[in-house]
């Protein structure tokens, strides 16, 4: 009887230990605790709640009552052995339970670190995505602005080319007008030099004529001097002859009174001849001078006529050249007016393009402000969406209510 009771109590004790081992993480796959309130499922998720503490206490009390009754019926010796065995089993169960609690705590810390790593990885990926999206947006805006700047640069280049062509046309017109002026000045200068050379030729001709006249006058004067010296020599000879005659006939003065009278008559006749010769020479001289003055006046008239003729021809040439210059100037003026009109049209077109560019810049600034406000709204929306996604990932198996999940998250963050 004692042996059967001992075997029965030993069997019950082994069954109790097996049940305790199954309860603390053996075959049933979950662990119950009245103090901690944690429960670890087979999937690896943490389940929280107050569960099973009173049931375990009731089972222990029922088992203890049955043991005490059995030990009371069978004998006092077996009661002491069963109580000691039960005490050792409870100690082992407590040790096993402590080990399971430590394992549970380590698993909970691992899960916390895994969740933190996962959330930080999601935050990093979301930040990198936002950064890449911002970079793409900035690159798009840069490309747009670069295209606009390139278009405005090409427009400015074309405007500069138009302006340069206008300035070149203006400078070409100025060069043409200056060239025509230089040509006309050169023609006038050449005509002036021709007139000067013609005047010099005329002056040289007049000088040659005056030199010839002077030479002829010198020859005439020389001949007049020769004639005068010949008359003087003649008179001297006659005087010498008369002196010799007077000297030879001085002794015969009284006897030759008639001879003296004849000598006086001869001298008077000689002096009269000399006076007549001098008068004829003065008449010849006056005639020559009058003819010289007539020739001089005729040459002066011819000279003035030639000058008038040359001046008339020169005036006709200058008139013809002036007409040609007026025609060239009218053509240049017409071309300059056309160029000025084209430059005015291009300047109005440029002002219009500048106004269009300013309006486009204002529209672009308004678009940039709108895009910045949209970026801020997009960042807020993404932040809110990320928070919602984190909450959803945390409570994806719906183990918690909405308030419980938020409370546990706040506790984890704290």
Swiss-Prot record:
GO biological process, one term: negative regulation of flagellated sperm motility
Keyword Transmembrane helix: no
Low complexity bias: start-end ranges: 277-294, 358-369
Gene Ontology MF, one: zinc ion binding
Disulfide bridge positions per record: none
InterPro entries, sorted: Seminal_vesicle_protein_repeat, SVP_II_CS
Annotated region described as Disordered, given as residue ranges: 170-228, 240-294, 306-369
PTM-bearing positions, type Pyrrolidone carboxylic acid: 23
Composition bias type Polar residues, residue spans: 240-259, 306-321, 342-351
Residues spanning the signal sequence: 1-22
Record PROSITE patterns: SVP_II (PS00515)
Sequence repeat locations: 108-120, 127-139, 140-152, 153-165, 166-178, 179-191, 192-204, 205-217, 224-236, 237-249, 257-269, 275-287, 299-311
PANTHER family: SEMENOGELIN 1, SEMENOGELIN/SEMINAL VESICLE SECRETORY PROTEIN
Protein role: The rat seminal vesicle contains six major androgen-dependent secretory proteins referred to as SVS I-VI. The SVS I-III proteins appear to be components of the rat copulatory plug, with the SVS II protein being the major component.
Protein name in the entry: Seminal vesicle secretory protein 2
Name of the coding gene: Svs2
């Amino acid at each position: 009887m004692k042996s059967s009771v001992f075997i029965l109590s030993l069997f019950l004790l082994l069954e109790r230990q097996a049940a305790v081992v199954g309860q603390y993480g053996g075959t049933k796959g979950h662990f119950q605790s009245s103090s901690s309130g944690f429960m670890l499922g087979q999937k690896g998720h943490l389940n929280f709640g107050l569960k099973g503490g009173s049931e375990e206490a009731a089972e222990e009390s029922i088992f203890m009552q049955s043991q005490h009754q059995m030990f009371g019926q069978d004998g006092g010796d077996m009661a002491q052995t069963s109580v000691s065995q039960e005490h050792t089993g409870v100690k082992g169960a407590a040790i096993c339970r402590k080990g399971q609690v430590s394992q549970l705590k380590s698993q909970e810390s691992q899960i916390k670190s895994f969740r933190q790593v996962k959330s930080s990885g999601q935050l990093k990926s979301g930040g990198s995505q936002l950064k890449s999206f911002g970079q793409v947006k900035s690159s798009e805006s840069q490309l747009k602005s670069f295209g606009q700047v390139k278009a405005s640069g090409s427009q400015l280049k074309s405007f500069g080319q138009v302006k340069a062509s206008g300035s070149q046309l203006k400078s070409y017109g100025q060069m043409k007008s200056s060239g025509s002026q230089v040509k006309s000045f050169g023609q006038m200068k050449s005509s002036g030099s021709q007139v000067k050379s013609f005047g010099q030729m005329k002056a040289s001709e007049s000088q040659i004529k005056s030199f010839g006249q002077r030479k002829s006058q010198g020859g005439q004067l020389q001949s007049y001097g020769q004639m005068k010296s010949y008359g003087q020599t003649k008179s001297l000879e006659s005087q010498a002859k008369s002196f010799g005659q007077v000297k030879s006939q001085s002794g015969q003065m009284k006897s030759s009174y008639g001879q003296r009278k004849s000598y006086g008559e001869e001298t008077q006749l000689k002096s009269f001849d000399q006076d007549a010769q001098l008068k004829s020479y003065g008449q010849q001289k006056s005639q020559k001078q009058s003819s010289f003055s007539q020739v001089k006046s005729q040459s002066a008239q011819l000279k003035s006529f030639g000058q008038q003729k040359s001046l008339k021809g020169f005036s006709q040439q200058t008139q013809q050249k002036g007409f040609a210059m007026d025609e060239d100037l009218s053509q240049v003026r017409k071309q300059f007016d056309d160029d000025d009109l084209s430059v005015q049209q291009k300047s109005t077109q440029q002002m219009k393009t500048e106004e269009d560019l300013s309006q486009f810049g204002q529209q672009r600034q308004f678009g940039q402000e709108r895009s910045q406000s949209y970026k801020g709204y997009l960042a807020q929306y993404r932040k809110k969406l990320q928070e919602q996604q984190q909450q959803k990932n945390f409570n994806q198996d719906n183990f918690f209510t909405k308030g419980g999940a938020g409370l546990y998250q706040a506790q984890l963050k704290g």
